[in-house]
Amino acid sequence: MSVPSSLSQSAINANSHGGPALSFPLPLHAAHNQLLNAKLQATAVVPKDLRSAMGEGSVPEPGPANAKWLKEGQNQLRRAATAHRDQNRNVTLTLAEEASQEAETAPLGPKGLMHLYSELELSAHNAANRGLHGSALIINTQEQGPDEGEEKAAGEAEEDDEDEEEEEEEEDLSSPPGLPEPLENVEVPSGPQALTDGPREHSKSASLLFGMRNSAASDEDSSWATLSQGSPSYGSPEDTDSFWNPNAFETDSDLPAGWMRVQDTSGTYYWHIPTGTTQWEPPGRASPSQGSSPQEESQLTWTGFAHQEGFEEGEFWKDEPSEEAPMELGLKDPEEATLSFPAQSLSPEPVPQEEEKLSQRNANPGIKCFAVRSLGWVEMTEEELAPGRSSVAVNNCIRQLSYHKNNLHDPMAGGWGEGKDLLLQLEDETLKLVEPQNQTLLHAQPIVSIRVWGVGRDSGSNRDFAYVARDKLTQMLKCHVFRCEAPAKNIATSLHEICSKIMSERRNARCLVNGLSLDHSKLVDVPFQVEFPAPKNELVQKFQVYYLGNVPVAKPVGVDVINGALESVLSSSSREQWTPSHVSVAPATLTILHQQTEAVLGECRVRFLSFLAVGRDVHTFAFIMAAGPASFCCHMFWCEPNAASLSEAVQAACMLRYQKCLDARSQTSTSCLPAPPAESVARRVGWTVRRGVQSLWGSLKPKRLGSQTP
């Protein structure tokens, strides 16, 4: 364990904070050989308990300062720096653990007492510093034990050589440049007050002490104390030799929000507090660029995204230094500075003529322009665009093309314009990609044919826009991804507005079609899908019969009328003259069709049927229809094996039609239809119409008798 021999009285007093001063019974600055000589060995007394070890007993006179301890401390710090150990982290045990271990295994020699006192002193410093930072600033060099073991192994035979070396080293290292005069009486705070009083001053003094000692260790080790905002200072603000003056941190009204001007020995630079970015130039004139920050380039590694996405080691990139013009958009997020191409403006500084063209385009409300750069396209399947999966698939395409390791300027990547700056225009319901220099149209995509569009959801990908559409030549689905200069949600919002406008126009067009005030010339390309309710198919029964023909009759009802017509036709014609045909019976219509030619021989409405009956022969069937005012016609049929099925079907159609007429007629309106049976009519209309119903009943009675005859 090495103890620095060049401590300032003010630094030690700042650490003690007025605690009880303790003196060590042994000179901590004496050489090894001086402590081990015969005189000291004869007079040295081992303390009986820890209280005497802490220096509360008698105190002998301290010996002269020894420069060899300083040499050992510097050598051990140099070796620790070579082994890449963190000099700002203390790996010593706690004060209680060290005290218990030292009490059990304390050596009985004077050299063991010297190590005990030095360790107690350093433990007090560590406990005080741990109160503020959680870890002390003092380095435990006890692990560098091989040097100490070599000294013990060498024994007294090498003491004479060490005396000669000490004399030479004292001449070189007795007064190193920049170090104050050594102190002989070093006071170390003890008790609980040393752990609680003034943790801020403890940390500053300890940082000053070991920062100065490390600065003298070696040239290559001096780089650990960088000049960034995270590095410890070499002293407290009250010290006159501090590298930081009281006005080191300044906030100027000329600086943007979040910026601070920092002054130190390296110069004046500007610190952006939210992101931790530093730059030499004032932030008002240019944003931070690579190569201008005093921080190390390793600090630009994208580490925040690694925990979220779990990329492999090769997926993290650093921003390469760029010598191009600074960005026009000001300070960007720190994640965006680590993308695969340099964090610069997607388009160079426009010439005044180009600015005028852009302003003219933006002035036109029908055209919206966005500066983009094509990252390529990825082939997709129809299953990936299913509801609930399309958003995940599009985001995966954005992630794949945004963070891949290949060169984005490679023309084989599938990007429009070979990775150069483009203009994405939304004009006349069309998405266009235009080359900004010569206004060459590279691609035109109708917005109505775009299946899906979206914006990157990952951290730092809010400037990535993608849309999915079917290629005209290959008919495959492609997801095109673009890196936008402005937030990509602006493009998505504009597309949403255009689609809403298109849907509104189509709804208005449908309303015009329904109102029969439509200009068909404007709706040639608009597909209309009008769904009409399917017509209800009525039950139709077909019967194979022989059609005997039709004859006019004098009365609309009567079995004798039907029998007379059937007898006249059967007597005047033979079976060969009958026409084979089909009779289709529907609830509304009776249709007679030719069996071979399907020609319509007759069509009768059921509502005009006045009477039906089966003839004297069970194979014959006939019904009377009203052909006009006071004009009636009788249609006759020959059925096989009998006419029962046909007569029942026609009777059922008549009953269904009659029921529909009753349902459609209002209760107060009168009807010209034949009345139902007398009993039901009497219940409805009362006794006032009984006489009229009875007269109708007389006309319907022969119908019932005729329908029951075989």
Swiss-Prot record:
Keyword terms: Acetylation, Activator, Apoptosis, Cell membrane, Cell projection, Chromatin regulator, Cytoplasm, DNA damage, Membrane, Nucleus, Phosphoprotein, Repeat, Repressor, Transcription, Transcription regulation, Ubl conjugation
Primary localisation category: membrane
Outcome of substituting W280F: Abolishes ligand binding
Positions with biased composition (Low complexity): 287-299
Post-translational modification: Polyubiquitination by RNF157 leads to degradation by the proteasome. Phosphorylation at Ser-610 by SGK1 promotes its localization to the nucleus. Phosphorylated following nuclear translocation. Phosphorylation at Tyr-546 by ABL1 enhances transcriptional activation activity and reduces the affinity for RASD1/DEXRAS1.
GO cellular component: cytoplasm; glutamatergic synapse; growth cone; lamellipodium; neuromuscular junction; nuclear speck; nucleus; plasma membrane
SUPFAM superfamilies: PH domain-like, WW domain
Positions of post-translational N6-acetyllysine modification: K204, K701
GO biological-process terms attached to the record: apoptotic process; axon guidance; central nervous system neuron differentiation; chromatin organization; DNA damage response; double-strand break repair; extracellular matrix organization; negative regulation of cell cycle G1/S phase transition
Modification type Phosphoserine: residues: S135, S459, S517, S610
Tissue and organ expression note: Expressed in the brain, retinal lens and muscle cells (at protein level).
UniProt cross-references to InterPro entries, sorted A to Z: APBB1/2/3, PH-like_dom_sf, PTB/PI_dom, WW_dom, WW_dom_sf
Domain of life: Eukaryota
WW domain boundaries: 253-285
Location(s) in or outside the cell: Cell membrane; Cytoplasm; Nucleus; Cell projection, Growth cone
GO molecular function, one term: ubiquitin protein ligase binding
Subunit field text: Component of a complex, at least composed of APBB1, RASD1/DEXRAS1 and APP. Interacts (via PID domain 2) with APP (with the intracellular domain of the amyloid-beta precursor protein). Interacts (via PID domain 2) with RASD1/DEXRAS1; impairs the transcription activation activity. Interacts (via PID domain 1) with KAT5/TIP60. Interacts (via the WW domain) with the proline-rich region of APBB1IP. Interacts with TSHZ1 and TSHZ2. Interacts (via the WW domain) with histone H2AX (when phosphorylated on 'Tyr-142') and the proline-rich region of ENAH. Interacts with MAPK8.
Functional summary from the UniProt entry: Transcription coregulator that can have both coactivator and corepressor functions. Adapter protein that forms a transcriptionally active complex with the gamma-secretase-derived amyloid precursor protein (APP) intracellular domain. Plays a central role in the response to DNA damage by translocating to the nucleus and inducing apoptosis. May act by specifically recognizing and binding histone H2AX phosphorylated on 'Tyr-142' (H2AXY142ph) at double-strand breaks (DSBs), recruiting other pro-apoptosis factors such as MAPK8/JNK1.
Name of this chain's protein: Amyloid beta precursor protein binding family B member 1
Native source species: Mus musculus
